């Protein structure tokens, strides 16, 4: 693990060099974890290009950092970003790239204020350049994602019998989440979405006290987290014989989702992938009922690059985990969403393919 993190820090140093900076200051917790292995609520890492990286954290995490990151210099301070900028100044670094997409204006002012007479370093924005390093996964990361997806599928199957009339959305969500933990998840990827009946028209409905009723469609969006890596899966089930309109939109979404998965290949523009599913839904007259993007990357965060949408830039690459999740949402009636997590793979031919990590059937489950 230390060697893996060292390789990642070398890539971050190359980002700094590419920006014309002497170092990069990483302050977002997820990126600090990616580059050092430390999980904390207060840490930052300064990575010179070239030079020895320095990890700063406070006394609560110092012992963990010493044991888990023995190969990196440790600085124990409460104001971690300020301590590292002071260190950069003392070391004569003239320019430091920083994560301007996550740092607040107040924090930036604090870092650039300094004491009277103090010079530099100059801070320049790195944007999401460090985030982009996380997009392509190594096989160890993919294995963790595969485990998270497997636990998610097992938990969903284990509590299917709780999807019955009289159970509330909240009760079912709690049973599902507890089962993921019991099956070995380190935590939840996110708070589960359980949307029944008319609530299914709300893509990110918060589970409440509504009781499942016969004739409901119930959309369940859930995920386990293993080793920090997040699974994401959505299935919609029918409680009793589905009506004609329910079968119709389920069939449309199923076909659009399958087409999206089949179209995945390295080098494909994310907007083109979105169009594969979106065009199919629009052709049925439901384009106005599919308002979100087709999918997104997953990893140490539940939503990360690439974002797959009609108005997004970027291309798919080998070893990038993504979701494919079209939906149709009919106000006051209900909705359907089907979502799989998969990995973009370069195949033997030019097209490549998608490696599915979600294993639950896409066929309509009638309970």
Residue ranges and their predicted role:
Residues 1-367:
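Active-site neighborhoods and metal-handling regions in enzymes and metal-associated proteins
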């Amino acid at each position: 693990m230390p060697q893996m993190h060292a390789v990642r820090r070398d890539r971050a140093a190359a980002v700094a060099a590419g920006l014309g900076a002497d170092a990069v200051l990483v302050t977002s917790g997820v990126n600090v974890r990616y580059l050092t292995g430390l999980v904390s609520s207060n840490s930052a890492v300064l990575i010179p290009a070239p030079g020895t990286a320095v990890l700063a954290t406070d006394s609560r995490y110092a012992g963990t950092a010493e044991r888990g990151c023995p190969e990196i210099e440790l600085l124990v301070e409460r104001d971690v970003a300020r301590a590292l900028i002071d260190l950069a100044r003392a070391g004569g670094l003239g320019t430091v790239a920083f994560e301007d997409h996550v740092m607040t204006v107040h924090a930036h002012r604090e870092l650039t204020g300094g004491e009277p007479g103090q010079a530099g370093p100059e801070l320049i924005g790195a944007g999401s350049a460090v985030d982009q390093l996380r997009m392509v996964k190594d096989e160890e990361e993919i294995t963790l994602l595969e485990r998270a997806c497997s636990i998610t599928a097992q938990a969903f199957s284990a509590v299917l019998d709780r999807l019955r009339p009289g159970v509330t959305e909240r009760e079912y969500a709690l049973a599902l989440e507890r089962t993921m933990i019991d099956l070995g998840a380190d935590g939840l990827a996110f708070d589960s979405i359980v949307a029944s009946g008319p609530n299914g028209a709300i893509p990110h409905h918060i589970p409440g006290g509504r009781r499942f009723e016969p004739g409901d469609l119930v959309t369940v969006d859930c995920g386990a987290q293993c080793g920090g890596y997040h699974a994401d899966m959505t299935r919609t089930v029918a409680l009793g014989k589905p009506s004609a309109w329910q079968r119709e939109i389920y069939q449309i979404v199923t076909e659009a989702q399958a087409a999206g998965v089949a179209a995945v290949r390295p080098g494909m523009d994310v907007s083109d992938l979105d169009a594969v599913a979106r065009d199919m839904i629009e052709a049925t007259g439901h384009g106005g009922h599919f308002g979100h993007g087709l999918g997104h990357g997953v990893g140490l965060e539940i939503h990360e690059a690439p974002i797959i949408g009609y108005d997004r830039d970027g291309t798919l690459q080998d070893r990038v985990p993504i979701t494919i999740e079209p939906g149709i949402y009919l106000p006051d009636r209900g909705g359907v969403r089907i979502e799989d997590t998969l990995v973009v793979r370069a195949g033997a031919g030019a097209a490549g393919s998608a490696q599915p990590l979600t294993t639950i059937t896409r066929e309509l489950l009638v309970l």
